[in-house]
Amino acid sequence: MPDKAASSAYLGLLRLLLYGGAYREMPSPPRLSKDAIIGFGNSGQLEMLQVLMDEVVREGVTGDFVEAGTFKGGVAMYMAGFLSVNDRSRKVWALDSFSGMPTPDKITAKTGRFPAGSLATPGGLASVQNDFARLGLDRYATLVPGWFNETLPTMPERGLKRIAILRVDSDIYSSIMETLQALYPKLSAGGYVVFDDYKFPFARKAVHDFRRRHGITSRMRWCNASSEPPMHKCPGVHDEFLYWKKAPRARSNRASTG
């Protein structure tokens, strides 16, 4: 059994490191460039993601943790850190082009957000690999570089069988749909799918289109300042995320997929 106190202390320090919190809490914090911060958002998101990770490990939900859209790798590193002290039988899969966004689909392009090449990972794949290694977390994660339409179909042959946590940070409509179509069937009952971009209209459309097409009725829940405890530590619209728990498949020819 892992030492809970030691695990909690380690993960708390890891959150501070990934989001620059150790510097922000200084009496006179240094000015950090955005490239010096590995994570996006704030550590409250990681605390709330940990609630879901704790549950799937405690309940024995089968599968690895997957992040589709990893950017600089902050969240994936936290998931790997969590597994390093809680369940080393699992691993993290982190997918990204590491070279920026693809040409946006028509639905996303109408909004003017995320043009081709935006959100390129500073330093590219090598930088993320180096950060995983510096933190001693590279053994718990596999980075999968490339466009989703090329890499997602290869995940079974790479060794991904089942998923317990699926974090979708794919940004644009087409990439979110590609992620869900390829990976949601691998999400185990009792596992969670988490969306970082639901605040954008094209992301909401992708989520609702996918749920409708597949008859998914699982209750959608928010992590933000107005959420039920303990999911209330993600303050502000830019830090919230949406998630739901996949239900077991109903015994019916017209069953939902959860």
Predicted regions and their residues:
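N-terminal auxiliary segments of SAM/dcSAM-dependent transferases
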Residues: M1-L11
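S-adenosylmethionine/decaboxylated-SAM
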Residues: L14-S43, E59-G258
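Conserved alpha-helix/loop element of class I SAM-dependent methyltransferases that forms part
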Residues: E47-G60
